[in-house]
Amino acid sequence: SLVKSDQICIGYHANNSTEQVDTIMEKNVTVTHAQDILEKTHNGKLCDLDGVKPLILRDCSVAGWLLGNPMCDEFINVPEWSYIVEKASPANDLCYPGDFNDYEELKHLLSRINHFEKIQIIPKSSWSNHEASSGVSSACPYLGKSSFFRNVVWLIKKNSTYPTIKRSYNNTNQEDLLVLWGIHHPNDAAEQTKLYQNPTTYISVGTSTLNQRLVPKIATRSKVNGQSGRMEFFWTILKPNDAINFESNGNFIAPEYAYKIVKKGDSAIMKSELEYGNCNTKCQTPMGAINSSMPFHNIHPLTIGECPKYVKSNRLVLATGLRNTPQRERRRKKRGLFGAIAGFIEGGWQGMVDGWYGYHHSNEQGSGYAADKESTQKAIDGVTNKVNSIIDKMNTQFEAVGREFNNLERRIENLNKKMEDGFLDVWTYNAELLVLMENERTLDFHDSNVKNLYDKVRLQLRDNAKELGNGCFEFYHKCDNECMESVKNGTYDYPQYSEEARLNREEISGVKLESMGTYQILSIYSTVASSLALAIMVAGLSLWMCSNGSLQCRICI
């Protein structure tokens, strides 16, 4: 007789996970395992970048630092920096009102510099024919007294004369040199002659690549910081073995110090109000540092260092495990785009904890779960390699630093913002589509592995067992634990059990045939009896109708 308890089932792992992922076909699919690839957290601090401290300018601007605003004395000499931090509206900018020519270009230059060495190129004491210490202003106070920018000299007439200046500096250093100078624009003609004696003045500056001639613009202006005059500052990069030549008969703000560019590298000027956090990171944003190996983040579009790519997404989760459908859940699930093919199995097994796919058997010796280690390990390796490949491809060093534009370049700035927004939209779309597609493929990959395991068992057992349609096989022979193990490891001996299985199949077939014969006899008897009863009823009705005249009966011979 058939031993119905001898069964083997193919199934998959389930657990108590509530992790959910999205696919092309479905949203919020619960899976056994998942990996978040979107970093959403930061520490809210400014940190060292790979062990190098940032240059945090506090209340000073880049212009205030480079020119030497008296309120920025703490930055007279600064060590190597990894990046520069400037507040959105620093208080200590150009203390004497005016402009810094090509300021945005200078900031762009600084984004590729990691260290300056300040050197004296024209000593203040060398201006014997001009007043080099009288050029101060109440707009630039220091310790309650009028002062001026530390790194340039405002030259004033001496003894009612302002002799024409002709000075040169030859860059004998091996490094490029950042040189700054300026011009003073008086409020009126009286101020012009009061300071410089000469009513008509000029400043000429020349290098191998620069040819500049400046004249003061005398005009009545509103007061800023108590000053109606204005100052305009300029800069150039002086190459090694090149010379810079100055000529002027008034209004000249001469360089005293210049900056030797001793180290170039990746840097940035970051706008942030944060304080230094005495920490280290590989990726810094204006919102805080990110320490993550994830390929994407949604913290801030501007970054410096080895950073994930910024996307506008709120959620990017990769499926690494299977659909989490414990066996107690009987409702039907939708299947995937690529033909998810393990739908014949009603649910996963929470009792199988040592693998993704495996078996459950039951026989006279008992029952139990066993994972298929080989298929599980291959699947783990495949999914892990895929996830790592995605992360490696996306997690390359990526910097996005802000660009600054002056008031005349607003249209360019707007166009630049639109282009950057467009790039971010494309990155976001690509990242989200990548996750949806890979999640679909991963879940279908798991379904395919379950189906392959099922087919492996089916091809071994052939007609020695019956497919029950729910992922299980019912043996036509007794299958002890040794037999069950042979099915699992692929060494099942079909001929050994085929005779016993054949006899049990025939016994089952005989029972079915005997039952079918009995049903046929009963059916024939029932049909004949019903027909005979109907004939008798019709004959009786006819005789009754003939006897009372309702029906005429004629017999013709």
From Swiss-Prot:
The chain crosses the membrane at residues 521-541. Disulfide bonds join C9-C472, C47-C279, C60-C72, C95-C140, C283-C307, C479-C483. Glycans are attached at N15, N16, N28, N159, N170, N291, N489. The record marks R335, G336 as: Cleavage. Keywords: Clathrin- and caveolin-independent endocytosis of virus by host, Clathrin-mediated endocytosis of virus by host, Disulfide bond, Fusion of virus membrane with host endosomal membrane, Fusion of virus membrane with host membrane, Glycoprotein, Hemagglutinin, Host cell membrane, Host membrane, Host-virus interaction, Lipoprotein, Membrane, Palmitate, Transmembrane, Transmembrane helix, Viral attachment to host cell, Viral envelope protein, Viral penetration into host cytoplasm, Virion, Virus endocytosis by host, Virus entry into host cell. Its main location: virion. GO terms for cellular component: host cell plasma membrane; membrane; viral envelope; virion membrane. Signal peptide: none annotated. SUPFAM superfamilies: Influenza hemagglutinin (stalk), Viral protein domain. Homotrimer of disulfide-linked HA1-HA2. Major glycoprotein, comprises over 80% of the envelope proteins present in virus particle. The extent of infection into host organism is determined by HA. Influenza viruses bud from the apical surface of polarized epithelial cells (e.g. bronchial epithelial cells) into lumen of lungs and are therefore usually pneumotropic. The reason is that HA is cleaved by tryptase clara which is restricted to lungs. However, HAs of H5 and H7 pantropic avian viruses subtypes can be cleaved by furin and subtilisin-type enzymes, allowing the virus to grow in other organs than lungs. This is Hemagglutinin.
